[in-house]
Swiss-Prot record:
InterPro entries found in the cross-reference section: UPF0179 (IPR005369)
HAMAP family membership: UPF0179
Protein's UniProt name: UPF0179 protein Mlab_1307
Domain of life: Archaea
Protein source organism: Methanocorpusculum labreanum (strain ATCC 43576 / DSM 4855 / Z)
Amino acid sequence: MDKEETIVTIVGSVLAHEGAEFVYAGKAAECESCKVAKVCHNAKLREGKRYRVVSVRKTKHDCAVHEGGAKAVEVAETIITAVIPTSQATRRTRITYTPVCDDVFCKGYAFCHPDGLTEKGRYVVLEVLGPYSECPKGTKNLKLVEMRPVPT
């Protein structure tokens, strides 16, 4: 198995534990005058992507955004579970993601638009979990898969 590429960043103390996940939202206005903003907003972090904390460092920082301060952590892009057409659902295949459905009121919307997945983003299908037959709209030929963004 490939070793995960990790990124050093700073997150709120509440999120600073192994396994915690978050979607990077970019800089807040309060970050402009912060002395550790360059680490917090590491150039390798991509807005809208989901990350998982893989290790926590001891250093704690005061933070104008996070109550209780912030800690340095190492993060990696996380695996995302989503629904895609069966025609794209082949293990180890690179795909360009297009959501199956755009109905925000649909019960299955979270599977078609999981946090951290971007439309027209490039992903590798890691695992095909099986058929997805629970589409409230009745769409056929769907699979539930685990994907990871293609490294850039």
